[in-house]
């Protein structure tokens, strides 16, 4: 082979190597570009998900108002009436709320059904269905009334949806200085006499005159002391929640709102005139709750249901407000707005509404 041929052969080989390297570099660049594009797409997807999650959280947790205002939809006593539910949802679908406060009696069960596991599963599914419909408007903080399955009152009650919370015998902090406490169920009903809504007559009512049992707060084994013992149990549960809130708050200032099914005993929002008896009244609330409202300076509101015809707002106890928004089954609901003024949450507006 000639010397020049050697050089020519060498040059051709070098060119082949360059071509291979060039092709390899192109393949690597192509792979890098694909990886970069994928990383960009993943980053964009995560950013979109985070944005949507933040928007959803803002809609639910911070609501439609500024940081020093809160708006709530107050509802109670559906009793399985899906027509009323549809009418309510249509009425409020354009409104914005931080939370819905549901005050018990989603369903209507007989006492025999309430303690049945078979019926519990059926009625839990109904409650889940109703909650999911309410969640189209806002997340729900709810308590059972006196018509739910026994499982809903238990410490380890089933989680019916991912968004809403059962706060029976619990509390939730919705602001650094504002707690929502919950206690569902009811105490026995007392058969009273003439009612005076301007008096809190703790000593004048015959607490042995029970005409209907409570649920789950009912201790018939005590006979004539059924109401008294059941109400002590009910009151102790409220006090236990209050103590848990105190521990959580530490030395920080705070206020509380109680969601209950029955209200304080002598509030006119919790009394019902007995039909056909003139001025004879039924007392359907808790004496212990009344005392707690009077004595607990941090508790500013009790919002309750239970007594369908006695909707209203009671401010008889100084500095405290008791609200019964009425029953959905009768076409009633309420809207409550709180505003923070001088570092204190106060009732800015309370509207009793109907559909």
What is the predicted function of each stretch?
Residues 107, 113-124, 250-298:
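Active-site-proximal segments of metal-dependent phosphoesterases and phosphodiesterases across multiple
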Residues 171-176, 287-296, 308-355:
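Binuclear metal-dependent phosphoesterase catalytic core
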Residues 72-82, 107-122, 190-205:
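Acidic/histidine-rich helix-loop elements
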Residues 62-73, 171-182, 253-257, 314-322, ...:
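Beta-strand-turn-beta hairpins that frame and shape the catalytic cleft
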Residues 179-280:
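Active-site-proximal loop/helix segment associated with metal-binding centers of metalloenzymes
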Residues 74-77, 100-105, 139-146, 166-169, ...:
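Active-site neighborhood of phospho(di)ester-bond hydrolases with catalytic His/Asp-centered motifs
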């Amino acid at each position: 082979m000639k010397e020049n041929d050697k050089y020519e052969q060498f040059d051709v080989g070098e060119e082949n190597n360059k071509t291979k390297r060039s092709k390899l570099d192109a393949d690597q660049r192509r792979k890098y570009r694909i990886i970069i594009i994928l990383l960009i797409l993943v980053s964009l997807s995560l950013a979109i998900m985070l944005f949507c999650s933040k928007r959803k959280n803002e809609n639910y947790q911070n609501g439609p108002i500024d940081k020093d205002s809160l708006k709530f939809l107050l509802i109670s006593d559906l009793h399985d009436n899906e027509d009323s539910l549809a009418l309510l949802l249509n009425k409020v679908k354009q409104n914005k709320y931080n939370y819905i406060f549901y005050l018990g009696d989603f369903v209507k069960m007989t006492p025999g059904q309430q303690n049945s596991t078979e019926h519990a599963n059926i009625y839990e599914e109904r409650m889940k269905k109703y909650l999911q419909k309410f969640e189209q408007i806002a997340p729900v903080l709810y308590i059972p009334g006196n018509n739910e399955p026994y499982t809903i009152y238990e410490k380890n009650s089933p989680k019916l949806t991912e968004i809403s919370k059962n706060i029976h015998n619990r509390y939730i902090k919705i602001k650094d200085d504002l707690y929502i406490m919950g206690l569902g169920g009811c105490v026995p009903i007392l058969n009273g006499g003439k009612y005076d809504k301007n008096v809190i007559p703790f000593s004048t009512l015959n607490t042995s005159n029970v005409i209907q049992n409570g649920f789950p707060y009912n201790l018939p084994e005590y006979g004539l002391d059924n109401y008294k013992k059941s109400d002590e149990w009910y009151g102790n549960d409220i006090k236990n929640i209050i103590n848990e809130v105190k521990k959580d708050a530490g030395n920080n200032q705070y206020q509380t709102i109680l969601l209950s099914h029955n209200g304080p005993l002598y509030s006119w929002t919790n009394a019902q005139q007995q039909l056909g008896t003139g001025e004879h009244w039924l007392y359907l609330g808790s004496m212990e709750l009344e005392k707690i409202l009077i004595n607990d300076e941090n508790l500013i509101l009790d919002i309750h249901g239970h007594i369908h015809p006695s909707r209203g707002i009671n401010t008889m106890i100084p500095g405290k407000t008791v609200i019964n928004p009425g029953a959905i089954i009768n076409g009633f609901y309420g809207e409550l707005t709180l505003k923070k003024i001088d570092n204190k949450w106060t009732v800015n507006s309370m509207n009793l509404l109907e559909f």
